[in-house]
Amino acid sequence: LKKDGKLPNGLIAPFKQLPVLDVDGKIFAQTGAIARFCGKLSGLYPKNNEFEAAQIDQIIEAAQDINYLVTLSGRDKEKDRLALARKILATKHLPKWFQFLENLLAENKDSNFFVGNKISIADLAIWRLLGWLSSGLLDGVPTNILEPYEKINRLREEVYKHPKVNEWMLKTYGKKI
């Protein structure tokens, strides 16, 4: 993406930022919009069930809220203030949000997924976010931060089992799960 918002094919990114998706010369921007578009095409987002769509949307927006908290916690580059911000994130904010997610998973008695009995874009969004949060890449966020959350860990296992996820992991990271 060039500074003026042009993509390599000459089209303009609507907000002059990534991500964008080019479908036959039509450009879509914003992670949620792209996820819903692809989700509808792939069966990971409901086409005709507005209730399930709203349930999925609330999870995606929760992931955005969590991501925002992580971003805020990393803004201060002064070492001691950054460490304090990350400590608050890891001991206060993230556990609160993880419990919200745990409660939503408990409400779905049909499966280990957030909505219905099959994987959706909500599950994928949380799976990737949780992978990052527990990766050790974020100073001050322990890699075992998810240990207390049984349902979240079951969700992660279910997502890891999906053949397309394994295919993506192999292609992206050179390893299967």
Residue positions per predicted region:
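Residue-level recognition of oxygen-bearing side chains
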Residues: 33, 151, 164
